[in-house]
């Protein structure tokens, strides 16, 4: 059986680690969001009756924004792993390069 090069093994290990971290984080987020999603669902007809009410403070308390601080951390870790993988692949390619001809040939 042929062994994998070091960069390929490192890429595979980093990819598996990131995938397991991502699945664990998404499972935790979905379990915490499922209980909060059922709480505040008013009837659409009642919102039309309240024309002069400012809903921004209530929306700020009830609705989560797009990405919380853990999401930014996960994105930063994901991108850094991606760039590290690309760097390792480039280093692996550079290590495998061989010159086509010797440097000290007569012109």
Swiss-Prot record:
Stored InterPro entries: TMEM213
Q: What is its main location?
A: membrane
Question: Residue ranges, Cytoplasmic compartment?
Answer: 92-107
Q: How does it sit in the membrane?
A: Single-pass type I membrane protein
Q: Name one Pfam family in it.
A: TMEM213
List locations, semicolon-separated: Membrane
Topological domains, Extracellular: 28-70
**Keywords, in A-Z order:** Membrane, Signal, Transmembrane, Transmembrane helix
Report the protein name in the record: Transmembrane protein 213
Give the organism the record lists: Homo sapiens (Human)
Q: Which gene encodes it?
A: TMEM213
């Amino acid at each position: 059986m042929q062994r994998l090069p070091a960069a390929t093994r490192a890429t595979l290990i980093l990819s598996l680690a990131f995938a397991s971290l991502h699945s664990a984080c998404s499972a935790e987020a979905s379990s915490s969001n499922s209980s909060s999603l059922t709480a505040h669902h008013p009837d659409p007809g009642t919102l039309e009756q309240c024309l002069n009410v400012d809903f921004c403070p209530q929306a700020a308390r009830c609705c989560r924004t797009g990405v919380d601080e853990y999401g930014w951390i996960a994105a930063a870790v994901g991108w850094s792993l991606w760039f590290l993988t690309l760097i390792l692949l480039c280093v692996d390619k550079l290590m495998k390069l061989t010159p086509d001809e010797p440097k000290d040939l007569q012109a």
